[in-house]
Amino acid sequence: MDLGKVITAMVTPIHPEKDKVCKKRIHHLVNHLIKNGSDGLVIAGTTGESPTLSHDEKIKLFRQVIETNDGRAKLIAGTGSNNTAETIAFTKEVAELGGIDAVLIVAPYYNKPNQDGLYAHFAAVSEASDLPVVIYNIPGRSVVNIEPETIIRLAKLPNIVGVKESSGNLDNISKIIAETSDDFQVYSGDDSLTLPILAVGGNGVISVASHVVGNEMQEMIQAFERGEVQKAAQIHRELLPLMNGLFSVPNPAPTKYLLNQQGISVGPVRLPLVDLNAEQGTKLQAILEGLSK
């Protein structure tokens, strides 16, 4: 299942005065992303501040993105949690909205399941879901790593179509690509590893940087796929300072800062995250401005 090459892990626009998910700002952001290189969107993922969104806010967010998108980009809804039964129930509810192409299911966090528990969790969600499932492996946040052998087993299930790999382990990612079918999609979960993962056979990126350099991310991937490896590598090197700068403080505060500076109003982050201070903002803006020199 082709979900796109540059899939943006979309921030959630918040009204700065009312502290509510803002439909007008969602509409503006979705159009901006699609016009600037995104062929897919992840909604209510980590970058979308899912831990601080209520159930009703997520549903409101999904509905507005579906309406604005109008079938243009692939939509992947973040419906995972560390509670299998709750994940299944929420995934079913989201499927009934229509207009969602797949769900992103994060590895259960905090309760630290072993590999058998991880397999059983994803298998149960897959069996119950009418929507295709993308596994999200992010051991830096979930504490547990979904081992390659577990992902390879899960890839054999008919409704599990891909993985967002944020482990940063190219050996493991290479093994997954080598031992799964060609239609199993392997996405980099780190902007800075997009090109290396493409080089070992990956399919694209679920990106944060694409909020501000989406066209450049597309250009890099397309250059690589045309065999213009040196051009792709040059773009990668040029974008690398920004990719790293967007994680200089906890995500998505830097991304929201740059979008707001560019006139794409997405509001603040929610506590316990905090917005950039003046010094942090100045440094980040300088990195972005340096790309055009």
Swiss-Prot record:
Top-level taxon of origin: Bacteria
Keywords per UniProt: Amino-acid biosynthesis, Cytoplasm, Diaminopimelate biosynthesis, Lyase, Lysine biosynthesis, Schiff base
PROSITE patterns, per the entry: DHDPS_1 (PS00665), DHDPS_2 (PS00666)
Site (Part of a proton relay during catalysis): 46, 110
Residues binding pyruvate: 47, 206
SUPFAM superfamilies: Aldolase
Pfam families (alphabetical): DHDPS
Gene Ontology molecular function terms on file: 4-hydroxy-tetrahydrodipicolinate synthase activity
Gene3D superfamilies xrefs: Aldolase class I (3.20.20.70)
Protein's pathway: Amino-acid biosynthesis; L-lysine biosynthesis via DAP pathway; (S)-tetrahydrodipicolinate from L-aspartate: step 3/4
GO biological process, one term: lysine biosynthetic process via diaminopimelate
Localisation per UniProt entry: Cytoplasm
Record-level GO cellular component terms: cytosol
Assembly with partners or alone: Homotetramer; dimer of dimers.
Function comment: Catalyzes the condensation of (S)-aspartate-beta-semialdehyde [(S)-ASA] and pyruvate to 4-hydroxy-tetrahydrodipicolinate (HTPA).
Protein name (Swiss-Prot/TrEMBL): 4-hydroxy-tetrahydrodipicolinate synthase
Native source organism of the sequence: Listeria monocytogenes serotype 4b (strain CLIP80459)
